[in-house]
């Protein structure tokens, strides 16, 4: 099925799609065995494009992709089986205003992020609007890159957030530091592992290395998105 426009995507993505095809069509290195493309954009105009191939990517492809990257003012990643070539960077930084504050999020290619920034902002505002019933400490399971964690942290004494993806944990740690938030800690545990740790059935070196002592927390709220 031919698709020249995808209305669910941002206007920036829709504008870039035909430009990307037109530029790539001029280069055999870029167009041959080009299988798929993924876009990650931000409200401020950052654009990360992942070009996926059914061939081995070599130096000639890199030269052509660098020229495309410069011409379209985007960041390009090339992927093939067993290959990931990052020409500039493998992330974008999104800024979302929630209430009276801007929150900055590093969103890494290949990891889960909320796909619609405008809807995401509404989700965050909705969650924060329930704060009157909150207090104490927050436990968030599977926090991703800290999407909800950051704004919710303003309404709790301490926040412990769990996540199993190393990539998402890394992004969440960056986001915490970039937003100057001091009451959040991230534990790389599944929900089952957290339960084992919290009930004392099992000890995890990961918690000790992160300086997390579960008895320091008095959880009043559990949050799962």
UniProtKB/Swiss-Prot annotation:
UniProt cross-references to InterPro entries, sorted A to Z: SAM-dependent_MTases_sf, TrmA_MeTrfase, U5_MeTrfase_fam
Residues engaged in binding S-adenosyl-L-methionine: 114, 142, 147, 163, 225
GO cellular component, one term: cytosol
Superkingdom as given in the UniProt entry: Bacteria
EC number(s) per entry: 2.1.1.-, 2.1.1.35
SUPFAM superfamilies: S-adenosyl-L-methionine-dependent methyltransferases
GO terms under biological process: methylation; tRNA processing
GO terms, molecular function: rRNA binding; tRNA (uracil(54)-C5)-methyltransferase activity, S-adenosyl methionine-dependent; tRNA binding
Enzyme class: transferase
Keywords from the named record: Methyltransferase, S-adenosyl-L-methionine, Transferase, tRNA processing
Catalysed reaction, written as an equation: uridine(54) in tRNA + S-adenosyl-L-methionine = 5-methyluridine(54) in tRNA + S-adenosyl-L-homocysteine + H(+); uridine(341) in tmRNA + S-adenosyl-L-methionine = 5-methyluridine(341) in tmRNA + S-adenosyl-L-homocysteine + H(+)
Protein task: Dual-specificity methyltransferase that catalyzes the formation of 5-methyluridine at position 54 (m5U54) in all tRNAs, and that of position 341 (m5U341) in tmRNA (transfer-mRNA).
Family per similarity comment: Belongs to the class I-like SAM-binding methyltransferase superfamily. RNA M5U methyltransferase family. TrmA subfamily.
Annotated protein name in UniProt: tRNA/tmRNA (uracil-C(5))-methyltransferase
Organism field: Neisseria gonorrhoeae
UniProt lineage: Bacteria, Pseudomonadati, Pseudomonadota, Betaproteobacteria, Neisseriales
């Amino acid at each position: 099925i031919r698709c020249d426009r995808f209305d669910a995507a941002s206007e920036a993505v829709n504008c870039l799609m035909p430009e990307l095809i037109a530029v790539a069509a001029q280069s055999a290195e870029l167009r041959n065995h080009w299988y798929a493309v993924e876009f990650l954009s931000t409200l401020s105009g950052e654009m990360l494009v992942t070009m996926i191939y059914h061939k081995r990517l070599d130096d000639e492809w890199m030269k052509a992709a660098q020229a495309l990257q410069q011409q379209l003012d985007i960041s390009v990643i090339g992927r093939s089986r067993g290959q990931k070539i990052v020409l500039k960077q493998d992330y974008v930084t999104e800024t979302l205003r929630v209430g009276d504050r801007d929150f900055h999020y590093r969103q890494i290619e290949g990891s889960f992020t909320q796909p619609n920034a405008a809807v995401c902002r509404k989700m965050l505002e909705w969650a924060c609007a329930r704060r009157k019933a909150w207090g104490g400490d927050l436990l968030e399971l599977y926090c991703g890159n800290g999407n909800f964690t950051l704004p919710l942290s303003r309404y709790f004494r301490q926040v412990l957030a769990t996540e199993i993806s190393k990539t998402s944990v890394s992004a969440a740690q960056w986001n915490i530091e970039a937003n100057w938030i001091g009451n959040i800690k991230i534990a790389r545990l599944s929900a089952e592992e957290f339960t084992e740790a919290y009930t004392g059935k099992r000890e995890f070196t990961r918690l000790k290395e992160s300086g997390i002592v579960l008895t320091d927390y008095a959880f009043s709220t559990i949050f799962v998105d």
